[in-house]
């Protein structure tokens, strides 16, 4: 089996219409990602959002669609690598597939895994597809909740749900204006239930 130079793999998790494509398009358009070499983008499902040909050309990105989960195996992926010869790989993962069973070629190394979640539909998926959602979240370095405009009061509960599965993940909340700088009570270095709040020197930055 073909085994070439080590490749960095970036996996973007999320259910259909969660905003994965929007996130990847934004990433490809950033100067920090326009590094030497070419990128292979593997789509595991086709959403309504499309990738503009101009962006693909400008970011030196090839794109391939794999809609059959069985084709996402080390042998097939090694053949694809040999065909496209990418320097790095982005996988837009199908949230309905079993991530636990996913195996990559031996020279593919996971560089980063992120999960994108539509905050407006999170309760539905959390209630009805908890095991699939947990599999996406468990090994992700970052969880991005978008479309938070109408669910601001629910964000502390959403955060606790995520932390119950992955305590170390960074959690980002976004609305139509961008990232929400939300400070949660459990992150504060003091107890709000006490009559007197005592700040240590590390706490002053929060009030700045």
Q: Where are the model-predicted features located?
A:
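Nucleotide-state-sensitive switch-loop elements of NTP-binding domains
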Residues: 2-112, 116-124
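Phosphate/Mg2+-binding loops and adjacent switch elements
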Residues: 88-166, 170-173
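Residue-level signal for alpha-helical context at structural boundaries
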Residues: 41-42, 131, 158, 180
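C-terminal accessory "lid"/substrate-recognition subdomains
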Residues: 151-208
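Short, low-complexity, polar/charged sequence segments that are solvent-exposed and flexible
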Residues: 29-30, 59-63, 110, 132-137, ...
